Structure formats: structure tokens, C-alpha cells
Amino acid sequence: MNIAQLFVIVGPYYTVPVTRGSPNPRFLRLPQRLTKARKAADVTRRALEQKAGGTNGAILYIEEGRRVPTVETVARLAHALGVRAAWLAYGVEELDAAGFRSTTVGMAARLLAVRAAQQLSRAELGRRTGLSPRAIAKIEAGGQSGVDVIEMLAKALRISPAWLAFNEGPQVLPASRRGRPPAQSPADAR
């Protein structure tokens, strides 16, 4: 089977399944944030690839949503653009980095510490995320993973994906305000 036949069967785009009625994953807006930051920095795709050490076409594929980057790639892109990786990957924290360099150093230790604190086995975390225990072990051993996988792990552990990946922002995201706030007095309940 050649690549042309594969595209006919699978299609040229990498799609991420989204459950209807639940909030979209934060990383899905990464292509729009990357395009916005690149244009604000007045940098071409090619120049950004060279500055961040990427491969030919990588920025185009990410901006078109055809590729989900690793957290390490996002950290390099964020540094090249002068923005925070937490903002670029997940829309968390602020846009401006102001001399700050995002890094994924310590991600493995943070994942292991949170999993141990919650007394979860790799198998149980795997069931919650759909990942294999071996995949979780590889990340805990220092392996890199996509921003989508890190967000799945963070959601299952009820922590911030930006904190897990880049050690930026609070460990736990504030609860989103959906729906009507609770009644403050009996008169408000009517």
C-alpha cells in the first residue's frame, strides 16, 4: 500500500474525536493561536521553522490542524515567538513571555508525583484516558508526548495541562462557570 492509497482510505487530516455536549479540548485552538502569534511577530512559516528547529512544512501542518505537536515542539515554538507555551498549547496563562522560557523539564516527575499522590496505578490511569500503561510509563520515564495526550492525562488527574506540561500556571484550573450561579437567598431561588 502506498501513501496515495492510504490517503484515499484515511484522508489527509488527523482528526480528534470530540464528545458532543462536553467542552472541547483546550489544545484544539492551538492552530489559531499559533497563526495569531506568528503573524503578530511578523514571521513567515519558513523563518519560524528555522528559528524553532522544525522540519519543512511542520508549521503549515500544525496551523492547518493536520498535525498535533509534542509539548517539546510547542515549547520551542513559544520561545521562538516570544509567547508562553501554556498559552500557545492550551490558552492558559498570558500571551506575553517577557524573557520567560517555557520548558518541559520536570514533566515526568510532575506526572509521577500527581499519580502517586492520587494513589492511581498506571493501569487505572490508562483506563481513564484510553492510553496503555506502557505509554504512561514512557512519559513518566521522560518521553515526550503530544499536547493532546498530556491534556487527556491532566483531565483524568483533574489538574491543569499547562502545569503538567510546562510547570506554568496553577496546578489546578479554576472551575468553569457554566449555567446559572447558585441562589444566594431564598428570594433569589424563586
Q: Where are each of the predicted segments found?
A:
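Arg/Lys-rich, glycine/proline-spaced intrinsically disordered segments
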Residues: 21, 175-183
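Short, basic-rich loop-to-helix N-cap that marks the start of a DNA-contacting helix
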Residues: 65-79, 142-155
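Short basic helix-loop element that most often maps to the first helix and adjoining turn
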Residues: 32-51, 76, 107-128, 152
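A short, Lys/Arg-rich alpha-helix, primarily the initiator
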Residues: 3-40, 94-118
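Short C-terminal boundary/hinge segments that cap the last helix of small helical domains
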Residues: 82-97, 158-174
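Recognition helix of helix-turn-helix/homeodomain-like DNA-binding domains
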Residues: 53-69, 130-145
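Conserved hydrophobic/aromatic packing and binding residues within compact polymer-binding modules
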Residues: 34, 45-49, 59-62, 88, ...
